[in-house]
Regions:
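Helix-to-beta-strand junctions that scaffold the AdoMet/dcAdoMet cofactor pocket
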Residues: 68, 127-128, 141-143
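Conserved class I S-adenosyl-L-methionine
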Residues: 1-47, 58-62, 82-85, 89, ...
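Conserved catalytic/acceptor-binding region of the Class I
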Residues: 131, 142, 146-218
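A short SAM/SAH-binding and catalytic strip from SAM-dependent methyltransferases
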Residues: 116-131, 153
């Protein structure tokens, strides 16, 4: 199985199912960041828009409302699990100018010159061949079409992810991803993203560095948040099941010690650092 197929399997099965289960939590965490990226996304009523790696559809719906019924938005994701949830979400809201499909943005054919603009909230970091993927997006954009996306900066600058993981890695073998390999932090390096976009044909590339405190595990006690993290994080969930009770308790106590300063009024409040990138065809 190649790395792109592995990502599809991961996001359709283990990670996708957990994401759908925790959809409210994930959207609460990511929506403020997505909203900032959308504020940089120059779309107007009547445009046709592509939402890349749309997940469970929250940004797709936001875009659909902004372009009104004159335009439409296509939400594409290679996770069937998440697309099914996105369809339910949009139908519940009665959104008409929207369509969802299971598509591999890297490898599946997209309609040529179909879209005025493309957007992604943390959905473009998982390609095994990013230049191939971004060229495919490029082909789907009309002349002077715009692409805007948000992605994480370095793992070390995002303690919401890194702080607990560093503790877990002391007790469980969590494979370290190779530099720039598919994953949440694939585009931490600004020059790497710039080279991908340039080699894919884009112009007028702009970067915005965005720092924002984000909420995790809203409504939970600190202890419940740690338990949820330990039991539900896809990259080590299976290995955690076979870990001894003593080691699990050590992990719990060490994470509690590190996370306590971030706990504020029934949620964890962590700093985050992202890139928002804008460019044109």
């Amino acid at each position: 199985m190649n790395s792109n197929e592995e990502q599809k399997d991961y996001w359709t099965n283990s990670a996708g199912k957990l994401w759908v289960k925790d959809k409210v939590e994930k959207d609460n965490m990511l929506e403020p960041l997505g909203n900032y990226a959308l504020s940089k996304f120059d779309i107007i009523e009547g445009m046709n828009v592509l939402d890349i790696g749309c997940g469970t559809g929250i940004t797709t719906v936001q875009i659909a409302k902004k372009i009104n019924n004159i335009g439409y938005v296509s939400g594409l994701d290679f996770s069937e699990t998440m697309i099914n949830e996105a369809i339910k979400y949009s139908e519940k809201l009665g959104i008409k100018n929207i369509n969802f499909a299971v598509k591999d943005i890297q490898n599946d054919e997209l309609k040529i010159l179909e879209y005025d603009a493309a957007f992604s909230r943390f959905g473009v970091m998982f390609f095994s061949n990013p230049i191939m993927a971004f060229k495919n997006i490029y082909s789907a954009l009309k002349k002077n079409g715009i692409l805007t996306f948000i992605c994480w900066q370095s793992q070390k600058e995002n303690p919401w992810y890194n702080s607990g993981l560093e503790i877990v890695k002391k007790y469980i073998d969590v494979p370290l991803p190779k530099e720039n390999s598919p994953g949440p932090f694939a585009y931490a390096d600004k020059s790497y993203i710039h080279n991908i976009l340039t080699n894919s044909g884009y112009k007028d590339i702009e970067f915005y560095s965005y720092e924002k405190d984000i909420e995790l595990f809203k409504g939970l006690t600190l202890e419940s948040a740690i338990r949820e993290y330990i039991e539900s994080t896809p990259i080590f969930k299976e290995k955690m099941l076979i870990l001894g009770a003593l080691d699990k308790e050590k992990i719990f106590l060490e994470i509690k010690d590190i996370w306590e300063p971030y706990f504020k009024d029934k949620h964890l409040l962590f700093p985050s650092k992202t890139w928002v990138i804008k460019c044109k065809k």
